[in-house]
Amino acid sequence: MVTIRADEISNIIRERIEQYNREVKVVNTGTVLQVGDGIARIHGLDEVMAGELVEFEEGTIGIALNLESNNVGVVLMGDGLLIQEGSSVKATGRIAQIPVSEAYLGRVINALAKPIDGRGEISASEFRLIESAAPGIISRRSVYEPLQTGLIAIDSMIPIGRGQRELIIGDRQTGKTAVATDTILNQQGQNVICVYVAIGQKASSVAQVVTTLQERGAMEYTIVVAETADSPATLQYLAPYTGAALAEYFMYRERHTLIIYDDPSKQAQAYRQMSLLLRRPPGREAYPGDVFYLHSRLLERAAKLSSSLGEGSMTALPIVETQSGDVSAYIPTNVISITDGQIFLSADLFNSGIRPAINVGISVSRVGSAAQIKAMKQVAGKLKLELAQFAELEAFAQFASDLDKATQNQLARGQRLRELLKQSQSAPLTVEEQIMTIYTGTNGYLDSLEVGQVRKFLVELRTYLKTNKPQFQEIISSTKTFTEEAEALLKEAIQEQTDRFILQEQA
């Protein structure tokens, strides 16, 4: 029989008492009164803050948006199908934040920064708030470096600078996303990180964009944030802020970033849905009163940082869809007033075969030539003027039967200039190729060709220049100026190529 020794028992009890560590936690809790349509009403949660994350019993996370006298309105980050009336909810004391790191490059994630491409978890040790304050006035500097899109019409006449916000606006199916994806493709080798945010898009459209980027090797420097049309409204509302937080992470590390929001009007619709379900008073077009602030606080985060902060930049290209060309609707006018210019895509131009269908007459960049290299300024000034005169003459020529020779020549030149602005999708041009193309058109070297031959001639000229006169590209890229030497090389190449082209056509 084992003898029980009293001193051993007392030692064990003493050890247990010493090891006992009772943590006292104060948890702010509440009870679910009602749940449905992605909204929950909670009784209790007296200490909760606006925008604070709350956790439901079964694990769903929500954001406290409405703080009323007798209940709290919470929007759910998920379907919330397992939440029951009477179940408990606790405040977390945190506001929405996401992990950030270099490991996100090349991945497709959702609004909570969770990977959705089936390639495993993403390791990150740092966190950023989804909604952080935009840089102040002292933290910024004016935009002065170009962000090349690879599209002649934009880079020559509506230039975009690093740190600018430029709206891409137009009807559905006019090539808005194509302009944005071409811009991403053109950043290859430019040391620019790209973030593409798809809000409420069809999953097939997002898959198509991702496939294009993968095929062209652009996913290496791109992050795709996707919340498709079947996602809860809360996640569609958060997705752009998640994208902005990821872009900011790189911007504050002295890198250049480009973020594309496709499109903020879908975000506004998701926010309208949430607001109406929370019983907030509706305003114009049933949007809540703070829908302007929804977009302004997002787009103000795009900036060119001052030299003391490392001169990083975040360029934003929001895409807004209009209904039959109506730019005076609520969301388009809001975003136009927040951004530094807009690129207007016209359905009529698109249907008449002018692609990209950019209406140069009403598109504008409020940064202007500050966002162009000197060489581009030297050749592009003439282009916009000639195209504007051509548009005016073309309208007049419809009514006039007999036109003098000078007017006929001007119309012929205008048709060829319009032709050189056409580009195939996913075929952005380098700035050197653009300068060569514009110079050829504005100096009358295309006037002797038929309109239908212009594109073929330009493609062959680019190839000829690259193989036989590589010094031209070197001069432009090193000096950023269209020097006399570069002009002489270009004239020589154009002359040689014109002779070859005429012989080919005759043969």
Swiss-Prot record:
Please give the start and end residues of each transmembrane region.
none
Catalysed conversion reaction:
ATP + H2O + 4 H(+)(in) = ADP + phosphate + 5 H(+)(out)
Q: Which GO terms describe its molecular function?
A: ADP binding; ATP binding; proton-transporting ATP synthase activity, rotational mechanism
In chain numbering, the residues marked as site (Required for activity) are 363
In short, the EC number is: 7.1.2.2
The record's family statement is:
Belongs to the ATPase alpha/beta chains family.
Q: What task does this protein carry out?
A: Produces ATP from ADP in the presence of a proton gradient across the membrane. The alpha chain is a regulatory subunit.
> What is the protein name stated in its UniProt record?
ATP synthase subunit alpha, chloroplastic
| Protein's membrane topology | Peripheral membrane protein
Q: Where does ATP bind?
A: 170-177
Where this protein primarily resides, as one coarse class? Answer: plastid
Q: Keywords, A to Z? A: ATP synthesis, ATP-binding, CF(1), Chloroplast, Hydrogen ion transport, Ion transport, Membrane, Nucleotide-binding, Plastid, Thylakoid, Translocase, Transport
Q: Which SUPFAM superfamilies match?
A: C-terminal domain of alpha and beta subunits of F1 ATP synthase, N-terminal domain of alpha and beta subunits of F1 ATP synthase, P-loop containing nucleoside triphosphate hydrolases
Q: Which InterPro entries match?
A: ATP_synth_asu-like_sf, ATP_synth_asu_C, ATP_synth_asu_C_sf, ATP_synth_F1_a_nt-bd_dom, ATP_synth_F1_asu, ATPase_a/bsu_AS, ATPase_F1/V1/A1_a/bsu_N, ATPase_F1/V1/A1_a/bsu_N_sf
This entry carries the following GO cellular component terms, namely: chloroplast thylakoid membrane; proton-transporting ATP synthase complex
Question: Which EC class, in a word?
Answer: translocase
Q: Does the keyword RNA-binding apply?
A: no
Quaternary structure? F-type ATPases have 2 components, CF(1) - the catalytic core - and CF(0) - the membrane proton channel. CF(1) has five subunits: alpha(3), beta(3), gamma(1), delta(1), epsilon(1). CF(0) has four main subunits: a, b, b' and c.
Compartments, as annotated in UniProt: Plastid, Chloroplast thylakoid membrane
